[in-house]
Regions:
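Juxta-kinase regulatory segment immediately upstream of eukaryotic protein kinase catalytic domains
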Residues: 2-64, 254-259
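Protein kinase catalytic-loop region centered on the HRD/HxD motif
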Residues: 161-172
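ATP-binding glycine-rich loop module of kinase domains
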Residues: 39, 47-100, 107
Length: 260
């Protein structure tokens, strides 16, 4: 696992909502609320020991702020016995009937040393370690970061991608790196959200992340401003070689060319 402070005791906040509160009903049973579904899910929440959910995050549903929203689940900040965690809530309209598949894929990532650790799960919920930090795009737009910090974050992110390639787990969404990499206050990087992952596709974690970091999009634009990347053709050639043979030597070649 990545070296960052993930689970810790917390003080009392005004946005800390007891799980019994009716204000959480539309989040717990999002997007189609029924009394029966809500009641069943509340029992699951009790069994998992979840005490509070926080209204905090960059996404809003009604008056509730949450950490994220995807096609399969919502993510909220939660508390279990005075410890912060992340809680994934399966959407009532999700194509998947349980969270089992995602848990299995997430565990493969964890076995490779990637991603926040899974703490517990049930049919409709997954509890993981909480990553306290900024999305990589918000982090890199900070005017106070220096080239060495950027190199370290890129190296860490790409190393994790290489580990996923070697574990034969394709994340599936690393071409949209800004939504799936969080950088902590200590500049530790964490790849999150494995709901689109697969062991059946050819892995392209390194090449997808490199595209976002070095070649196209807002993150790469800022990286280039700070590090003055080499010619695109050199990076593209190295990525093509790696795509044919995902060896350590070919990975190191990408990094030596890109992050000088």
């Amino acid at each position: 696992m990545q070296s960052t402070s993930l689970s810790r005791p917390i003080p009392v906040f005004s946005n800390r909502i007891n799980v019994n509160s009716p204000s959480l009903s539309t989040i717990i049973s999002y997007p189609h609320f029924t009394e029966r579904e809500y009641s069943n899910r509340l029992k699951e929440i009790y069994s998992l020991g979840i005490d509070f959910i926080f209204s905090v995050g960059r996404t809003k549903i009604g008056s509730m702020e949450i950490a994220g929203k995807g096609c399969v689940s919502l993510v909220v900040k939660a508390e279990i016995k005075n410890t912060i965690c992340a809680l994934k809530i399966r959407r009532t309209d999700a194509s998947r009937k349980t969270m089992d598949r995602e848990v299995n894929l997430h565990r493969i990532a964890n076995s490779a040393g990637v991603g926040p650790g899974i703490l517990d799960y049930s049919e409709n919920f997954v509890i993981t370690e909480y990553i306290d930090g900024l999305s990589i795009i918000n982090w890199i737009n900070n005017q106070n970061i220096n080239p060495e910090q950027v190199r370290n974050v890129i190296n860490s992110t790409m190393e994790q991608c290489y580990k996923l390639d070697k574990a034969h787990l394709d994340h599936g969404e690393l071409c949209r790196l800004d939504h799936h990499v969080i950088v902590s206050q200590s500049d530790a990087t964490n790849i999150i959200d494995f709901e689109s992952s697969s062991t059946k596709r050819k892995t392209c974690n390194v090449t997808a992340a490199a595209q976002s970091l070095f070649l196209s999009g807002l993150v790469s634009k800022r990286v280039n401003e700070i590090l003055h990347l080499p010619e695109r053709e050199k990076i593209i050639k190295a990525l093509r070689i790696y795509k044919q043979d995902q060896s350590r030597n070919n990975f190191d070649n990408i990094m030596s060319i890109s992050v000088r």
